[in-house]
């Protein structure tokens, strides 16, 4: 029987492709793996007691999800701006994200020179920082009349995949830096604005939330891509 850590890695791989249109390129390669999860995964055969999913595969999946979420977040920003952006004054558009307290590299070049341990912590902290905002955003969009179905679908998908992604990144982190403790993540305090009876207040809250989500999703993908290239290969 494969060890618990291997089972968690295998379960995460299967979770990536369940219940979503995401990762069509990965579905075929993982279908047999997921169907056979009661037995040893294909890469565990003849390796009883010491099986691990290849690190390259873990990074491939994580970066694919992160890239997908980043693109979805960008699409959400564009769709929201097209529908509501003109009704928001320039002063309200000033963005102060709740994750601004997390000190991140100022550029990709600076990120490339940042230690692995720090990049892992940044990714995990950023992902956890969006647990509550995404939950409330999806709830409010679902309960609001006139919400674009496409906008709601994108928000739901990002929420689902962000949860899967953070699990996967933690699996990778434990493989590379076992025993490493992560930093506390910032608390989101904009729920009252997101649920306000004032339509303008709500629109500004969603505007800021979507723009911050896009910013952070891009950072997450960039950091994971750097880690992948540094620790495995950039070719896939």
From Swiss-Prot:
One Pfam family named in its UniProt record: Hormone_1
Record-level GO BP terms: female pregnancy; mammary gland development; positive regulation of cell population proliferation; positive regulation of lactation; positive regulation of receptor signaling pathway via JAK-STAT; response to nutrient levels
Primary location recorded for the protein, binned into one broad class: secreted
Top-rank lineage group of the source organism: Eukaryota
Record GO cellular component, one term: extracellular space
Localisation per UniProt entry: Secreted
Paired cysteines (S-S): 44-51, 97-212, 229-234
SUPFAM superfamilies cross-referenced by the UniProt entry: 4-helical cytokines
Record's keyword annotation contains Zinc: no
GO molecular function, one term: hormone activity
UniProt KW keywords: Disulfide bond, Hormone, Secreted, Signal
Signal peptide, first to last residue: 1-36
CDD domains cross-referenced by the UniProt entry: prolactin_like
The family this protein is said to belong to: Belongs to the somatotropin/prolactin family.
Protein name: Chorionic somatomammotropin hormone
Native organism: Ovis aries
Recorded name of the encoding gene: CSH
């Amino acid at each position: 029987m494969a060890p618990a850590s291997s089972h968690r890695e295998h379960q995460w791989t299967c979770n990536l492709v369940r219940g979503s249109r995401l990762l069509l390129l990965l579905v075929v390669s993982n279908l047999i793996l997921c169907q056979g999860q009661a037995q040893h995964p294909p890469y565990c055969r003849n390796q009883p007691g010491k099986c691990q999913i290849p690190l390259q595969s873990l990074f491939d999946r994580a970066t694919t999800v992160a890239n997908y979420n980043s693109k979805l977040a960008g699409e959400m920003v564009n769709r929201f701006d097209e529908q509501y952006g003109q009704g928001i004054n320039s002063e309200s558009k000033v963005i102060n994200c709740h994750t601004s307290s997390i000190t991140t590299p100022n550029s990709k070049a600076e990120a490339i020179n940042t230690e692995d341990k720090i990049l892992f912590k940044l990714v995990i902290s950023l992902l956890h920082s969006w647990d509550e905002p995404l939950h409330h955003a999806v709830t409010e969009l679902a309960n609001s009349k006139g919400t674009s179905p496409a906008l709601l679908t994108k928000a739901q998908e990002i929420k689902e995949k962000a949860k899967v992604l953070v699990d996967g990144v933690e699996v990778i982190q434990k493989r590379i830096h076992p025993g490493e403790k992560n930093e506390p993540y910032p608390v989101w305090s904009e729920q009252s604005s997101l649920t306000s009876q004032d339509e303008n207040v709500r629109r500004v809250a969603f505007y800021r939330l979507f723009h911050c989500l896009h910013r952070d999703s891009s950072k997450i993908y960039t950091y994971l891509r750097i880690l992948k290239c540094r620790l495995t290969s950039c070719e896939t």
